[in-house]
Swiss-Prot record:
Catalyzes the reversible adenylation of nicotinate mononucleotide (NaMN) to nicotinic acid adenine dinucleotide (NaAD). Belongs to the NadD family. The gene is nadD. This is Probable nicotinate-nucleotide adenylyltransferase. Keywords: ATP-binding, NAD, Nucleotide-binding, Nucleotidyltransferase, Pyridine nucleotide biosynthesis, Transferase.
Amino acid sequence: MVDMTQLQAIYGGTFDPVHYGHLKPVEILANQIGLSKVIIMPNNVPPHRPQPEATSAQRVHMLKLAIADKPLFTLDERELQRDTPSWTADTLQAWRQEQGAEKPLAFIIGQDSLLTFPTWHRYETILDNVHLIVCRRPGYPLTMAHDADQQWLDRHLTHDVERLHNRPAGAIYLAETPWFDISATIIRQRLERGESCAEMLPATVLDYIREQGLYC
């Protein structure tokens, strides 16, 4: 029998600020595939993105507020302690070493990230350490740009949830998660214009943003 209580996943991002578009799809995903824990890991120096507007301490505080009543989530601040870029491959390799060789582990990404995955630093080592769980994004294709990358995807693709639980790593699973049309960019723009975004993020986070004078 497959133990459906062990599978854990890391969910990385800038979270500038954290919002329902981050949290709700992952909560639904956890119910769909039996995730026991989702570890939110904010990036320090995103290699491929602009620097966050909020400080690391402010982003951590917003995350703590957002997940305070959500036992599914825990927070890991290790990447914020680095002064170098947050390379996913290095983080996941360290996590695997901590958890041991047999525990099933996963990394959650969006479909947009899957399409650029072969450009990531040491991407070929990532599936040695974790499964990839891909949340669908509207408007993005399900095929890779290059034949070799498509062959790589086809080799690892699975539709079997149990495979995520009974093997420690190596599979790519396309999840049927809903899309929430919310982004941190939209929230920052609306706050700068003095517009409401109360439906986009937890009230505690919005109150903190106002207290700190962020994004205005």
